[in-house]
Amino acid sequence: MGFMGTHYPRLDEKGRLFLPAKFRDELADGLVITKGQERCLYVFPVAEFMRITEALRSAPIGAKAVRDYGRILFASAYDQVPDKQGRLTIPPNLREYAGLTRDCVVIGANTRVEIWDAQAWEEYLRAQEPAFAELSQEVWPTVS
């Protein structure tokens, strides 16, 4: 069914974060964490990351946007398996990129999980929610 919901875990001093219990099963065999858009982090199940990898691999190498996106995506990607307590370790460079502090927000975003700094997530919502109804007019025709 995909990842859904909003959760509020805390980052510990070692950069570890408890994954929400409802996400653990799908990520238990491995995940890839990397930079996302809007200064969040993307967490993909390995199978989904492989699907993205194949899509980028089949794109023309002459496409500059594909090369640029792929470089940043793959250079910042880390694969790992959550520990027995269901924690993932966020590397320092990714914590810095996303501005992660102690208070984080973990959201389900269908095929991926996103990790946000709590304040950045609140700012994003304040900026985006007024346009939510208008965006639905653009998005729904593409999915129905």
From Swiss-Prot:
Which taxonomic lineage does the organism of this UniProt entry have? Bacteria, Bacillati, Actinomycetota, Actinomycetes, Acidothermales
Tell me the subunit arrangement. Answer: Forms oligomers.
Q: Which organism is it from?
A: Acidothermus cellulolyticus (strain ATCC 43068 / DSM 8971 / 11B)
Listed HAMAP family: MraZ
- Recorded protein name is Transcriptional regulator MraZ
Record has Repeat as a keyword: yes
Which NCBIfam families is this protein grouped with?
A: division/cell wall cluster transcriptional repressor MraZ
Query: Where's it found, cell-wise?
Result: Cytoplasm, Nucleoid
UniProt lists the family membership as follows:
Belongs to the MraZ family.
BP-aspect Gene Ontology terms: negative regulation of DNA-templated transcription initiation
Q: Which UniProt keywords apply?
A: Cytoplasm, DNA-binding, Repeat, Transcription, Transcription regulation
Citing just one GO molecular function, the answer is: DNA-binding transcription factor activity
Q: Which residues form the SpoVT-AbrB domain?
A: 6-48, 77-120
- GO annotation, cellular component aspect: cytoplasm; nucleoid
Q: Which InterPro entries match?
A: MraZ, MraZ_C, MraZ_dom, MraZ_N, MraZ_sf, SpoVT-AbrB_dom, SpoVT-AbrB_sf
